């Protein structure tokens, strides 16, 4: 396992191995795994959660995070040349960039691992984190029925990617015309949530709010889901838009 670009590059057993490794890290193993090593990060200035958690994780494992703006990868200089230099200096490269094909090219040119920290079509580390957390609170999250509330963006496509690898059932609730394809979809949250165990959301662009007015996750909607169903909103979330203020303060929140 060299790179993490798409979850679909791996099998379910590979992801379970990552979960086991995560358990070992949490138990205090590998504290000096990255001692004397440098991790090069490419992130936009707007990133908060992902960059903080990556930098802290690298630090706790003894490594040195070195941060650049994502725009650095869009310069005129040939990407092959940039990666040639990084091969001498970096031990791992972690990048957030809208174009997944750029990350795939980096993985081709680099001799060190490349980690996808989000693109326009997926977010594998977000999915690994969510599924690992679910594995700690659910008997078998792959047997749960998932509902994604949102449009055809990177988070929805990421959940679809995860479902293909892990085999859990996934359906979508969205405004008309926002369907991802390949999934059963609903245009009303009260119909969509029936029989579901895990309700996942993504934030909405202002232009889509009217189209999603029947899709807001509320406490009343969560009561229509299965017993012990949980709400897993992807941050940043916006109260009064994809989720109600009340449901974000309820016992259903994950």
Model feature map: region roles:
Residues 34-39, 142-144, 228:
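Phosphate-coordination loops involved in phosphoryl transfer and adenosine-cofactor binding
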Residues 1-52:
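Positively charged, low-complexity intrinsically disordered leader regions
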Residues 34-135, 238-239, 243:
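Phosphate/diphosphate ligand-binding glycine-rich loop within oxidoreductases
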Residues 44-56, 135-201:
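Glycine-rich phosphate/diphosphate-binding loop of Rossmann-like nucleotide-binding domains
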Residues 181-253:
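Rossmann-like adenosine-cofactor binding region
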Residues 113-118, 170-173, 251-254:
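Short hydrophobic/aromatic-enriched beta-strand-loop microsegments
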Residues 57, 106, 162, 221, ...:
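Hydrophobic/aromatic ligand-binding patch that stacks against planar heteroaromatic rings
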């Amino acid at each position: 396992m060299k790179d993490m670009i798409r979850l679909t590059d791996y099998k379910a057993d590979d992801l379970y191995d990552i979960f086991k490794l995560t358990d070992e890290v949490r138990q205090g193993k590998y504290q000096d795994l990255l001692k004397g090593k440098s991790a090069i990060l490419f992130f936009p200035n707007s990133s908060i959660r992902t960059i903080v958690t990556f930098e802290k994780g690298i630090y706790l494992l003894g490594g040195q995070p070195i941060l650049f703006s994502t725009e650095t990868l869009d310069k005129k200089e040939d990407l092959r040349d940039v990666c040639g230099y990084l091969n001498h200096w970096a031990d791992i490269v972690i990048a957030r960039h809208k174009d997944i094909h750029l990350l795939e090219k980096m993985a081709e040119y680099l001799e060190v691992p490349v980690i996808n920290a989000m693109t326009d079509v997926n977010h594998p580390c977000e999915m690994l984190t969510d599924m690992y957390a679910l594995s700690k609170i659910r008997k078998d999250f792959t047997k749960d029925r998932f509902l994604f509330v949102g449009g055809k963006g990177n988070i929805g496509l990421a959940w679809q990617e995860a479902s293909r690898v892990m085999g859990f059932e996934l359906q979508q609730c969205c405004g008309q015309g926002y369907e991802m394809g390949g999934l059963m979809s609903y245009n009303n949250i009260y119909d969509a949530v029936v029989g579901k165990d895990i309700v996942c959301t993504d934030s909405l662009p202002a232009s889509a709010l009217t189209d999603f007015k029947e899709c807001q996750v509320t406490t009343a909607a969560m009561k229509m889901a299965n017993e012990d169903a949980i709400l897993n909103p992807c941050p940043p979330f916006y109260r009064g838009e994809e989720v109600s203020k009340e449901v974000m303060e309820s016992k259903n929140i994950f």
